[in-house]
UniProtKB/Swiss-Prot annotation:
Keywords: Hydrolase, Manganese. GO terms for biological process: adenine catabolic process. Its EC number is 3.5.4.2. This is Adenine deaminase. The gene is ade. Belongs to the metallo-dependent hydrolases superfamily. Adenine deaminase family. It comes from Bdellovibrio bacteriovorus (strain ATCC 15356 / DSM 50701 / NCIMB 9529 / HD100). It is an enzyme of class 3 (hydrolase). Its cofactor is Mn(2+).
Amino acid sequence: MSLSNKKTQKIASDLLPARLSQARGDGTLDLLITNVQMLDVITGDIYPTCIAIGGEHIVGVGMEYQTQSARRTWNALGAFVTPGFIDGHLHIESSMMSPFEFEKATLPLGTTTAICDPHEITNVLGGRGFSWFLRSSELMHQNLFVQMSSCVPALPGFETTGSDFPLEEMKSFKDHPSVLGLAEMMNFPGVIHADEEVLAKIEAFDDLNMDGHAPLLRGKALNAYLLAGIQNCHETVTLEEGREKLQKGMGLIIREGSVAKNLRTLAPLVNEFSSPQCLLCTDDRNPFEIAHEGHINYLIKELINKHGVAVHVAYRLATYSAARHFGLKRLGLVAPGKKADLVFLKDLKAVDIQEVMIGGKFVSELKLQDSLQEKLQTSQPPLENTMKRSPLTEKELTVNLLPGVYNVIEIVPHEIITQHLTVAFDGQKFAESDVLYMANIERYGKGLPPALGLVKGMGLKSGALASSVAHDSHNIMVIGTNPADMVLAVNTLIKSGGGFAVADQGEIKALVELPIAGLLSLKSAEEIKDGIADLKTAFRSLGVHLDEPFIQMAFLALPVIPTLKLTDRGLVNVTNFSFIPLQVEA
């Protein structure tokens, strides 16, 4: 399929007569699939059928094709067939994989389409990072759509980024076939209060999809946000919040990532009536969980087996509902004229995948591994060192505490929101346990001093954890029990070009290097997964009880998610978007 047809996935005009001939039964099919059980995600019916394929498209569905001549016939051996799965919102950078490695990891799991927002790499490298994702999408079998990163930085004036992404530069990418519209508009206060710069972006992309980001937004504020043209939200964390958003016509993108897990809370809202307005996403999911649990296939399985959602409804969310929401009219159904993106399953409830097809080709025959390095080289990933910071000293990361009361960030397990605590310190110890030192360190050569803070809920008993992944500006975040190990972990990342580090008693216990913008690895998914396993072993030995502390850490810097966050410029009270001091003023 030509790149220009990517959004519409339409059949090229010069091929249409041949496809019509195949559909009528006159022409020889390119592929005939027999002995297959159709799961109809519209009616909920399951019935035996044949699927006739010409080129990249389905030309017919029905038993009447079983005797038609075909260049190749494939017996599905009674397998069930569904449309390919669609991830409605994700940041590939959170997988730590290149787009090509992400494709290799998730396409065999049934994810034939992914709608991504590369605002992580865009915060670091600006348009150069964004354009790399566009170049990558052109080389992939998987349908990778790249939404236009709308908030770089997430909250201007509150954090330091490596680059910006001004409207004029955004417009230059608007007509690229991989761009569906505007990515999550995180600056919801700017929308609601008619910020000129924010409204200019909305106006420029009003003719395309516009994704939302509105945690806990309700009432008149939600009305104003929707009035501006925002279409969906993947940040819904309560049942009643989700119900109100559905009632007001907002697309409810139900998220189950590595940290933010909203499936259990929002699943009761999913039924036959609401399902056209509900879809699924992973948002931020690491390679360890992708390998051990799955991707969108995992979300479908959880909906069916843990939350009692009807089988056809669960699959509808992952296919037709998502395609319809984003205007991808040739995707999301097993029907004539649709792109032949198909998932064949031995068991629908277990989501036991037998084979996956993309554009009429079996994924098992694509040899994705063989072309990976060639694609990576062709796409020209940005490999310059983005850790533009001199090594730190212990003095710079020493939090000098006097007796008093301090503002403390409390981690909420499996959520990216935090709680705002005030905790007393008597000069020797805190009134509450598990309070640790933290710092956010600007890494883009601006020379800003580290911002210091306190955090509760990590469980760390010794040592330090440091990361160059700290949403969304991706400065260096470190949490530790002592300045020496904190400095060691941070300086190791500065030297290595970014990644994750665990330090204890003067030694680096584990290190995962992320040389592409301090966010992505050049290694395979298997190698990254093994590195994550080593990190887990290291931080577990130091007492950390969180499932994904590095992902949890990364969101402690994001000042558009409630309630208290630490950017490289200081503590941010997200309730009223203001800086506050570490020590509570008397």
